[in-house]
């Protein structure tokens, strides 16, 4: 008995009922589960929102989202919902703002790559950044020199733990 094109009312959907190999969201109950043994090959999910995984997740590789930051009127915002790796070539002294951190209880880390232009630029960090020994690092000053910083929060952005990942890189 085939239910392709309509939902079954008196029998479960089986693989034989799926003619095109695609199950639409409307065909799946919100509390449905698929056994891992039933998944094989490459699975390409299409979704929006969070994906919660119970147990271990293994990946051969993964990609992080990259955003290029620009500043205006000596200010730049890192929107933490948009990426988790940011790059910024300084064109002026800048004050950073970190916006849209995940809620308290969700751990989140991000990386910021800063490139000096031909003029020695300065950064003012958010007061919520807790640096090692409570001292913000001194920036590299040479034209084209790169500094990389990593940050971590788990309290909704009340505190960001800041670390130098590398300095005077090129």
Model segments located where?
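Fibrous stalk/shaft segments of extracellular and virion attachment machinery
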Residues: 1-65
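Short, surface-exposed loop/turn motifs at beta-strand boundaries within globular domains
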Residues: 11, 21, 81, 103-107
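Short solvent-exposed loop/turn micro-motifs enriched in small/polar/acidic residues
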Residues: 44, 71, 143-146
């Amino acid at each position: 008995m085939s239910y392709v094109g309509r939902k079954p009312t008196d029998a479960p959907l089986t693989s034989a009922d799926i003619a095109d190999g695609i199950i639409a969201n409307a065909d799946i109950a919100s509390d449905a589960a698929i056994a891992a043994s039933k998944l094989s090959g490459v699975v390409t999910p299409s979704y929006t929102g969070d994906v919660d995984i119970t147990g271990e997740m293994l990946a051969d590789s993964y990609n992080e989202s990259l955003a290029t930051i620009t500043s205006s009127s000596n200010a730049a915002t890192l929107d933490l919902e948009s990426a988790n790796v940011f790059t910024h070539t300084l064109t002026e002294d800048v004050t950073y703002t970190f916006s849209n951190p995940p809620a308290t209880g969700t751990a989140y880390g991000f990386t910021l790559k800063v490139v000096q232009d031909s003029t020695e630029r300065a950064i003012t960090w958010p007061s919520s950044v807790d640096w090692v020994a409570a001292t913000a690092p001194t920036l590299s000053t040479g034209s084209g020199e790169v500094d990389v910083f990593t940050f971590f929060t788990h309290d909704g952005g009340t505190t960001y733990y800041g670390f130098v990942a590398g300095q005077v890189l090129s």
